[in-house]
Amino acid sequence: MHIIKPSWLSHCGEQKDFEVYSCHVSPDGKRLATAGGDGHVRVWSTESIYNANTPDYNKPRQLCHMSHHLGTIHSVRFSPNGRYLASGADDKIICVYHLDKNPPAATFGTNEPPPIENWKTYKRLIGHDNDVQDLAWSYDSSILVSVGLDSKVVVWSGHTFEKLKTLPAHQSHVKGITFDPANKFFATASDDRTIKIFRFTSPAPNATQHDMVNNFVLETTISSPFKSSPLTTYFRRCSWSPDGNHIAAANAVNGPVSSVAIIERTRWDSEINLIGHEAPTEVCMFSPRLFHTSKPDPSVDDKSPSLVTVIASAGQDKTLSIWNTNTSRPVVILQDLAGKSVSDLAWTPDGQTLFASSLDGSIVVAKFSEGELGWVAQPEENDKALQKYGASRKGMGIAEDVDGLMLENQSKAGESRAVESRMGALMGDLPDSTKESTPVTNGTKTTAPTSKPATNGQSEAEKDKEPEKEQEKEPEEAADKTAQRVKELKSRVTVGKDGKKRVAPLLVSSSGTGTSSLPQTQLVGTTSNNKAAQNDAPQTTLDLAKPFDGLPKGGIAAMLLGNKRRLNLGEAEEEEEPVSKRAATGPTTIVTNGHDSVEPAALVPVQHGVVPTPEFLRPAVMNPSIAFAQVRLAVPKIRSHVLRPLDRGILQGESSLEDASKTPENIILEAKNDPNPRDPSHVLVSKRGALIWEEWLPRAIILVTATKQFWAVACEDGSIHTWTPAGRRLLAPIILESQPVILEARGHWLLCITAVGLAHVWDLKTQSSPSPPVSLGPILDIATTSLNQHSATPGPGVTSAHLNSTGHIIVTLTNGDGYYYAREMFTWQRLSEAWWAVGSQYWNSNDSSISALQSTAVGPASKEGKDKESTKATVSSGIIPFLERHTTNEFLLKGRAYGLQRIIKMVVQRKEAENLESSVSIAHLETRIAGALQLGAREEFRLYLFTYAKRLGAEGARVKVEELLNSLLGGILEENEEEEDEDDGHGWFSKEGDLCGWDRKELLKDVVMILGKYRELQRLTLQYAKVLDISLEDGPVDVEQMDVEA
């Protein structure tokens, strides 16, 4: 063993060395981070420390120093993935740093050596009310937990660094935190003389605090080893053994003697105490590696030496003791290691070197030789030791006691299939290959390198290098022209009315290059697997028609003809400015935001022979019927070219239909209108530049759409023409009451919305319509009063209209609302609105359980074939999350939620409305379930049902739970001897058959399992468990697969 104590390894001050409160070694073992009373975090090279006595060594010692705190820094910790470094201080702030690849800048006005590495502040986390005393990362770096003198335990996301949860479990200062290497628990030590164990499941990368309602649950409280422990220690830094079996707790007592308590996992009691310190201990730290008691013999495979763990402890007696589990006495005792208390310990990843920091400002290194502590075992031995705790099965929640094992044995088989199913993916149980291929971020898009198969000794990637080099030259050449053009725009001088010259201001538009942080939904059949694998933005299957590119950004304007006057009208009120007088397009954009700077907003040049979307030729000729209609929608203008690719739609990374039309595999429908209204229009269908068929029409073409079953175009005179894929006329022209404004297709369904607000839906396969024309008047607030009885007033605009695979209409409006037309009831139903966005705890457009995954649905075995089951599984899939994200875009992100949020906050403060948030959250879940049931969205229905059941259980809503179980039970146990006159119900009132495509009995069994852990409901759930014959010997049930993060 070698003791290394360099004189330069300290936090030096002008008059004295500052106290060093914390130290930690990076996962690669190359850096040592220390935090001290000078308010600095310093990063040192461990290689320079090991070579402190080598005169010829001239490499840098201090790699970087950061001074972003306003006081003493108490804790510093590297994340296990090595990406971040976190520090907590007495300024109540947590700083998270990341290593920037750019060279560092020299610090002005300091004697510090120039930094070698550029560690920059990535996030500043504010959530404590007093000093931050200790920090710890989970072993998968998914969460960061901080503890402090405000008695709080705060959990932060390790990806977004959003505050996920605050745990006010302790009654006094919290001074220590450690994580279970199996990633199932973490333990906190406090001056209330307890250690509390919290169970958790690693959250998804884009999880929010609303997802963590039932996560981070207190498992147990341990107090017996600390009943008379002193409160004079600065820290209570505890540590978890690398095999997951034990927790070492500092500042414990065994009678009158100070000790280190060893707490056994699962039983959570302490029968072992390490006695030897003469004063209270501040810190104890397990070596991260397991050790063999004797040197392993590679030739003997059958027997390997026994494994032990090594632990170091230190504290106020200035003594460092090192123990292992094979002996009752310390292996090493280093007395008077420092002049004051030892504040922190840190092992290197190889388990052979120990760093110790002290309040006297010194940092000591103890470097051990092979065999002194034992022989270091391979990292695979750690994994084997943790397998019994389910460390390799993320999010499974393996039972660790008898009760948990019994609960696990009550579930049904199918664990392996659930991993591949969408429900298994929604529970976070993805296979490793999937996680690597589709990493998830909070709505940002990054591309991962993918390897291509080699052909004839040369990979496809190498073949692609030459054209890539040619493409790289083009941006470089264009960059100079761009910069020159921007310079000209910036220096453009105008002369005002007064004759003075001034530089004209620039309008910078970010719409061209800005990307939203919200998840980007992919359409069914529109995205290739390779594209999906390279994009790690949240994905989901969406059963809707492709969006039409001709709609304006603000949606189609709607005018409503009122039929009543408003009450209490003031004569002095001014009428609103007519929509026709407002600028339709706004000011002309001169420059746009580029990747590095502003760029001129030049028109996109013609590429691959494809003409970009042109300016309109003229307005469409209006039908006289619009003048008498109560609903009037804006009619698209006549464009010279209208393009539509067949069914593949817009691929990821492509911003327009023009980009999609450049894809060689796409079949393109192109409509060309002549500038002369009297000349016919030309319809062409081509593939890879080759003409498939063409036709001329006597009227100008406004809209086009296409599926694999048919082509359709809408003309200026209100007629719709349809063709087969080969170009044969499918139907005679369909004549409508006014001009079409929206034309969409999905499968063999065709949707057309006209200028008078009527929606027509046709099934071209059966050449029929499921319902008469539907008016958009009810959802456009036509029933509201207007200022003038005979004048039109603006209403909410239509942002999109879609069809799902069963021909149902989905409409979104500019006010954020999303609607679905229930043709069985001949009425519109609102599936998403702003009220849920500001009042529900379950509103989350970045919901990891829905939008961050893309997989197939697997449910109970159906009597039909697998193809039919797969088709049934995707019906209406993703529609409700899509509508809620639209509401977020239209309502919350445009700043219109403040007023409603303020009203809700004022109402919640009243005593009679203290349960408003809970009530609104439950109502939101009930609306989701009702919408999913009406749409037939089986995956969303099951997910929302389980979330709803868990919330009802947490609320103890016995009446609703009983009614829910009765509705799920239906007629499972009833015989078929009922009266024939009684009509069969639908949805919750149905007695037989599946419920939204799921087996009633399986749904009921899963809901009973979810509710079974709530004791106040066990009398009720036990009855249903007996009815369903749920016994302890039924077989394995994966409860966590049914568990939904609320």
UniProtKB/Swiss-Prot annotation:
GO biological process: chromatin remodeling; DNA-templated transcription; regulation of DNA-templated transcription
Low complexity: compositionally biased ranges: 444-455
Matches recorded under InterPro entries: CAF1B_HIR1_beta-prop, HIR1-like, HIRA-like_C, HIRA_B_motif, WD40/YVTN_repeat-like_dom_sf, WD40_repeat_dom_sf, WD40_rpt
Ranges for the WD repeats: 15-54, 68-107, 127-166, 169-208, 230-273, 292-333, 337-378
Region (Disordered): 426-497
Keyword Nucleotide-binding belongs to the record: no
Record keywords, A-Z: Chromatin regulator, Nucleus, Repeat, Repressor, Transcription, Transcription regulation, WD repeat
Molecular function as annotated in GO: nucleosome binding
Gene3D superfamilies membership: YVTN repeat-like/Quinoprotein amine dehydrogenase
Annotated compartments: Nucleus
Transcription among keywords: yes
Major site of localization recorded for this protein: nucleus
One GO CC term on file: nucleus
Compositional bias (Basic and acidic residues): 460-497
Function, as annotated: Required for replication-independent chromatin assembly and for the periodic repression of histone gene transcription during the cell cycle.
Family membership noted in the UniProt record: Belongs to the WD repeat HIR1 family.
Protein name, UniProt field: Protein HIR1
Organism, as annotated: Gibberella zeae (strain ATCC MYA-4620 / CBS 123657 / FGSC 9075 / NRRL 31084 / PH-1)
